[in-house]
Amino acid sequence: MSMNGTSLLNEIIIDKGVKDTDKILGEMRSQIIKSLHQEEDGGQKDGMDISLCKLNIKKKLVEFSGAHNSLIHISEDELNNYRGDHQPVGLLLGDKKPFTKHEVKLKKNDMLYIYSDGYQDQFGGEKGKKYMGAKFKKQLLRINKESTDKQLILLEEEFKSWTHNYEQIDDVCVMGVRIT
């Protein structure tokens, strides 16, 4: 599904010229539903979660839309969580709603994070529980002033310490961007 998603993003953004993140996700959903024959019975029951950002460095603005994934923005030690919509790109049971577009004003040294659910869903610790979103956000707040290289090391160390003897259950992707 990821390869299909990458191909669709290129087609929608480059070939069709769609610029708004909410419209891009809407077009992706339509094309995935069509290509997997999801509008009819017997089609593949597959979808994709995604965070999509469009960063305008000159205007210091980020546009964000998400399908089951969020954007975390940390500015001056204040964390803002911009939630993605509770719907995938692809098969949707129930009402098909447009995706939401968030526009976030940025300042120098702000941090942006997009991430999969793998880090926070990982089992570990003394009681074998999930890491959870609140703990993940606290970790990002603790480390956001560090260089991005150091943040990577700290996230990896925390994950390794948390999982200890537990097997990794999902892919883990955390992407951080410092605004300069």
Can you name each region flagged by the protein language model?
Residues 6-180:
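Conserved subregion of the PPM/PP2C metallophosphatase catalytic domain
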Residues 2-3:
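Conserved long alpha-helical elements within nucleotide-processing catalytic cores of c-di-GMP signaling
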